[in-house]
Amino acid sequence: MNTLLTFVSINSENMKKKKNIAIVAHDNRKKDIIEWVNFNWQELIHHDLICTGTTGKMVEEALIEKCRENDEVPPTVTRLKSGPLGGDQQLGALIVEGSVDILIFFWDPMQPQPHDVDVKALLRITVLYNIPTASNRSTADFIVSSSLFHEKYDPILKDYTSYMKRDVDMN
């Protein structure tokens, strides 16, 4: 029996100067993420933003208000489904496709989530694809204030070719 296998390689695209930034927050952290967005709005408006559910609506509204007050053009905000409704998995798929450069995810460490397994899978994918990830304000501030944030960047990715080509014992 012949089996055709297609090996999918890890996307090795460079991060361009204009980044694709995913912004996600659990309900108890939405206030924190909006405070962070308001603090960093002048950086964020130069990038494309991807958000899950309600967070996306709140981020978009905050940036529209800041841009209106300062005569700036708001950024593109792509809104996915809410996390528990599949938004975290949509975001993970975008990472695998090479469409996300940075993840800012303020998750709630004190509250179990109905979609904890999806959150864990999303965080695993960020490690697998070497995506800079911030889970708190300090780390998020360090990411957007880094000189690398304002430049093209070539992330170093682990080569998983041997894993994809491994023999699996079917006995």
Feature locations, PLM:
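Mid-chain, well-packed structural core segment of small domains
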Residues: 85-124
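Active-site rim loops that border cofactor/substrate pockets in soluble metabolic enzymes
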Residues: 62-91
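General beta-strand structural signal in soluble alpha/beta enzymes
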Residues: 50-52, 79-81, 105, 133-137
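Histidine-anchored nucleotide/phosphate-binding helix
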Residues: 31-44
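Ser/Thr/Gly-rich flexible loops in soluble cytosolic domains mediating phosphotransfer, phosphorylation
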Residues: 119-150
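Short internal beta-strands
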Residues: 46-59
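Short, positively charged and aromatic/hydrophobic N-terminal segments
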Residues: 3-11
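Short, glycine-/small-residue-rich phosphate/pyrophosphate-handling segment
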Residues: 138-170
